[in-house]
Amino acid sequence: MNILFAVSECVPFVKSGGLADVAGALPKELKKLGVEVRIILPNYSLIPQKLRDGCTLHKVINVPLGWRNQYCGILKGEQDGITYYLIDNEYYFKRDSLYGHYDDGERFSYFSKAVLECIPHLDFEVDVLHSHDWHTAMVNFLLREKYQDNPLYEHIKTVYTIHNLQFQGVFPPEVMYDLLELGDEYFHSEQLEFYGNVNFMKGGIIASDQITAVSPTYKEEIQYEFFGEKLDGLLRKYNDKLSGIVNGIDTSVYNPETDSYITAQYDADSLYEKNENKRALQRYFGLPEKEDTPIISMVTRLTKQKGLDLVRTVFREIMEEDVQCIILGSGDSEYEQFFEWMAYEYPEKVKVYIGFNEELAHQVYAGSDLFLMPSLFEPCGLGQLIALAYGTIPIVRETGGLNDTVQSYDEETGEGNGFSFTNFNAHDMLHTVLRAIEFYHDKSVWEQLVKQAMTEDYSWEKSALAYKKLYKSLME
C-alpha cells in the first residue's frame, strides 16, 4: 500500500504549526504497520541547509500553469527511513515566511499542479494521495477533474485531512480561471465558488474520496454553524465520507524518560525527579523555589482562539491563590502586552517568555504542575497531549480534541486525567482552576492523577491503525 502525503510543511524540514508535526510523525508510525508513505512538500529557502544538502536532484520537469510553463526541480532525500520529495522553484518558495504572501493563491496553485505532474516521475506507484489543509486541497480536486482520465492516475484514491477549518485558502476567481484553467462550470455554489471568490478547501472537501478531521469531536463540531466557518452545510452534505481520527504525539520527541532538553529525566515511578524539573524551571525564571506552590503554565499561540479572553477576565482572581504562572508563546500584541503587564504587576508569581524556544518549552512541560488550555475551539490540540505525557495535569475546555483526550477527574471513582469545563465562560474556567488547585494539595489524590495521566498511550499508534484501515477501505 503506497501513500503520498502532499503537505505544505513537515518536521524536521519546516514548521509553522501542528500540521508539520502530523506530517513528520504519522508516516513513521504507518511505516511500522507496513504502509509505505512518501512525502512531497515545497523546497522552501527556510529549510535548514544541512537537510537540503541531504537531497539529490531526482528530475527536472515543466509544470503548466495557465498560459506558461514553470520550472520544477524534484529533489529526493531520506530522513528516519521516510522518502521525501522537495519541489524546487525559487520564484515561489524563496521567501522569508511560509505563508501570508500576496501571491499565495498562485504559489499553492503551482504546488498543487506540481504534485500531480511529478507523480509519473517519482518511481513510486501511488495508491492513495493524502492532502492536508487548504494548501494542497486542490491537488485532490484537480486529480478528479483534470487527471483522472489519464491511465497513470485513474487508480489513485484520495484522502483529505482538515487540520483547521478556519484557514480555507480563499482567493479571487482569476486564480481558478487563469492559473488552474478551470472554466465557468466550476464557479458556482456547488463547486469552488465561495461568496464571490474561490475556496481551495471547498475543492478538497468536494472531490476527495474520504475526509478526516483531526478528532472525533471536531468532526461533529464543524457540521454546526458556530464552528463551521460557513462550510458547515457542505460538511453536512458530505457527512457520509467524513470521519474523525485524533492525532498523537511523537514519543521519540516528547518522552520524559528520554528527553535531553529537561533537567532530570523521569517516569511515573520516579516523580521526585519531576520536582527537580520544577525547581529548575523556577530558577530559570527567577521565581521563588516553592515546592508546594503549583505552577500553572501555558505554551501557546497568543490568539483569541486559545481562550485568552477568559484568562484575561479572571487572571487577577487566580493570582489571589498561592500559585505561580508561566506563559510561553507569541501572537497578538494585545495578549502579549497583557501578560507582560501581569508579570510586572506580580513579579514573584508570573513570568512570561514572548517567542518560542523548543528547549524551554520541554522544560515548562516537565516542570509545571498544571497546564491551562481553555480554547474557544481546538481541532485536536498538541499541548494537552504533551502535558499528559509529562504528568502535567491539563485544565481544558470541552471542545474538539480536548474533549476527546482529557477526561475530567471524578473524585467518586478516582478516574480521569485532568480537569475540564463546558461553557466558554471565564468564571466556569476559574471554578475549574480552583478545583484543580484544591486537589493539587491532596498529595495522595494528586500523585494518583499524575500516574494515570502518564501511563496512558498518547503515541501515534492508534491513529496510524485508523488511517491504515481508512486507506485499505478505499482500495477494496
Curated annotation (Swiss-Prot):
One of its GO terms (molecular function) is alpha-1,4-glucan glucosyltransferase (ADP-glucose donor) activity. InterPro entries: Glyco_trans_1, GS/SS, Starch_synth_cat_dom. It comes from Bacillus anthracis. It catalyses: [(1->4)-alpha-D-glucosyl](n) + ADP-alpha-D-glucose = [(1->4)-alpha-D-glucosyl](n+1) + ADP + H(+). The gene is glgA. Gene3D superfamilies: Glycogen Phosphorylase B (3.40.50.2000). This is Glycogen synthase. Pfam families: Glyco_transf_5, Glycos_transf_1. The keyword Transferase applies. The keyword Glycosyltransferase applies.
